Regions:
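Membrane-proximal basic amphipathic "stem/tether" segments
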Residues: 8-9, 78-120, 127-128, 135-164
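Acidic/glycine-enriched edge-of-secondary-structure segments
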Residues: 5-7, 36-50, 70-72, 231-256
């Protein structure tokens, strides 16, 4: 039976690409559209108004598999916010406004670290800490496990049956930067990896992935505060591996972030583990390749130059003005499905079907 889906519109802006994919999957019998929902019925595009309309409050009591959430992208939301400010300030004052706001924010956060006395001490578990579940439809008591973001349908080669199988099986991304978290966001899947919203230098990352059970058994120990690009964040030890929690700005955030780390660690499934990294130059490939080769887990490695063994992202050189020499931005664009070219990898199939494709003696 195909998954039963409800389209939930949080924006009135129609996306022709999305509508085409939904129509294709519905016609192919890979999903069943039960109806539509929105805060206001006028937000439903004309092409979908022939479907039954459900009030949001009625959805939790219905029998359905997924609510497809159609909303404005984060970029569109930021652009709208910026446009409001731009209407009030001329360009030179706008730039000054952002600089002053960033300086004040950083100064305020840095003061909070002056009284932090947890350096060198393991961060204890906080099992009773309330960490609210983030669901795009949480206001209507629809859990994240029953939602799919519209962006997922725009992935290259998307098929609802393969995606539903991937949701059922799960996947554990272990990345040395934000790539894994961005992939979970794009796929609309539960984060079953603790390595989210952080980065790890390559030398540390290789030690980590080659002795993963040991490092996962270690507590998090705050080591020091690091200044980077005008901001300050904590560096946290996991054994002798340094984790850079560059999205953490206060001691309270560190406590909550560490608890998320521990809880996500418990959700890891080593049978669905995928290691992600990149070689930005042939010299780095020569330096680190043997370390990655020794790692016993499936690996996905990107390069900005042609390679028979790794995933070549040709758009890095073709869009030099966009990336300005930062190859990690290019790999993250792949995870966000914002890569300015044809993605040379089908994220939804390669690792979902990996075991089935292996010869019997390699399983």
């Amino acid at each position: 039976m195909p998954p039963k889906c409800i389209l939930f519109y949080k924006t009135a802006a129609a996306d022709e690409r999305l509508e085409a994919v939904l129509e294709r999957e519905s016609t192919a019998g890979r999903l069943e559209l039960l109806g539509v929902s929105a805060e206001e019925q006028s937000m439903v595009p004309p092409a979908r108004r022939a479907l039954p309309f459900f009030a949001p409050a009625a959805i939790p009591g219905m029998a359905f598999d997924y609510a497809v959430v159609i909303e404005a992208s984060a970029e569109e939301k930021r652009d709208r916010a910026r446009s409001r400010v731009k209407r009030l300030l001329p360009p030179f004052l706008l730039r000054l406004h952002y600089k002053i706001a960033a300086w004040r924010f950083t100064r305020k956060k840095r003061r909070l670290w002056q009284s932090f006395d947890g350096w060198g001490k393991p961060i204890e578990r906080q099992p009773d800490m309330a960490l609210p579940e983030r669901s795009p439809l949480g206001a209507w008591s629809i859990p994240a496990a029953k939602t799919i973001p519209a962006r997922t349908f725009l992935l290259p080669g998307f098929r609802m049956d393969e995606y539903a199988a991937l949701r059922t099986r799960g996947i554990t991304f272990l990345s040395d930067n934000c790539w894994g978290g961005l992939m979970y966001h794009t796929l609309g899947m539960e984060m079953t990896s603790p390595f989210i919203n952080m980065f790890v230098w390559t030398d540390d990352f290789i030690r980590l992935i080659n002795d993963l059970p040991y490092y996962l058994s270690q507590p998090l120990v705050p080591e020091k505060l690091r200044e980077r690009r005008g901001a300050a964040y904590p560096v946290v030890l996991l054994g002798d591996v340094r984790l850079h929690f560059n999205h953490v700005t206060t001691p309270d955030e560190l406590t909550a972030f560490a608890e998320k780390w521990y809880r996500r660690r418990e959700r890891m499934d080593m049978d669905t583990l995928l290691i992600e990294s990149s070689f930005d130059t042939p010299e780095n490939q020569a330096k680190y390749e043997s370390g990655f080769a020794a790692c016993p887990y499936p690996k996905l490695i990107f390069t900005p130059y042609p390679s028979e063994k790794y995933v070549y992202l040709s758009a890095f050189d073709e869009n030099a003005a966009r990336y300005k020499g930062d190859f990690s931005d290019c790999t993250r664009d792949c995870a966000k499905n914002d890569y300015p070219g044809k993605i040379p990898l089908d994220f939804l199939q390669t690792f979902l079907t990996r075991t089935a494709q292996l010869p019997e003696e390699e399983k």
